[in-house]
Amino acid sequence: INPDALIGVPGTSLTNKDSRYSGLKRVSNGRSQPSVELILALKPDLVIGAEGFHSRVLTSLKKLGVSTLAVKVNRWEKLEQASRTLENKIVDSDSIQSKISKLCPSQKFSKSIRTSVLILAGVSPKMSPGQQSWSGSLLDRLGLVNATKGLPGSSEFSGYITMSNERLLAIKPEKVLVVNPSGDATKTIESLSPFFPGLKKTDFKVMDYYGLINPGSLSSIKKACSNLSDL
């Protein structure tokens, strides 16, 4: 969006490491909720937040007469929808749509050569994103098969299913992606190897949380798509 229109951002690992946001006011720290007082002090014309996580703060601001916009980006289509909304809401913004279309070009393959991929977003407990998740939509877009597609079940996180040891043994992925394992990545992969005796070490890959599980930023999305395209 138009950088001159941006006056404040959350203080996250993404924004704190990006020089483009170095001079902007932080309205939150880490995973904490944004401060209504700090936001009001900036006198914004529009406050954009994540549907669900920021709902309470957005509701409070709306009651105080501040214009708000809640977005939910849990599928690729939702990202495209959000980009169209932002272009209409914020004047002098570059074409977000054109940038997004170049991040992760859609790829189509014949069913016979599509690679089956298991994504483990958590190791304890073991959780895997289903089709109705950001990760699932990326796999679809890149012509990859989600190894948990069609599996029933759920977890405490919407769009994810808990993977028991029995389920891990039953599915036959060709690639296993482990997201930001705590501790030693090598040990984590070694602990998973017995569940997939037909796979080699090179069939396991460590991926970042941002881009694959949480969209994060356009840069993190591009990196995740590039890594997935190499599978």
Predicted regions and their residues:
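Basic- and aromatic-lined ligand-binding clefts that recognize polyanionic substrates
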Residues: 1, 92-145
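Proline-aspartate-enriched helix->loop->beta-strand connector
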Residues: 35-49, 66, 162-181
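A short, structured surface patch at a secondary-structure boundary
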Residues: 1-42, 46-51, 144-147
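Flexible loop/hinge segments that line or gate small-molecule binding clefts
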Residues: 18, 58-85
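Solvent-exposed loop/turn segments at secondary-structure junctions
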Residues: 12-15, 32, 46-47, 52-56, ...
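His/Asp/Glu-enriched short active-site or ligand-binding loop at hydrolase and phosphoryl-transfer sites
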Residues: 10, 135-159, 204-208
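Structured C-terminal subdomain patch of bacterial secreted/periplasmic proteins
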Residues: 77-98, 105-107, 171, 175-231
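Short helix-initiation/N-cap motifs at beta->coil->alpha
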Residues: 27-37, 152-166
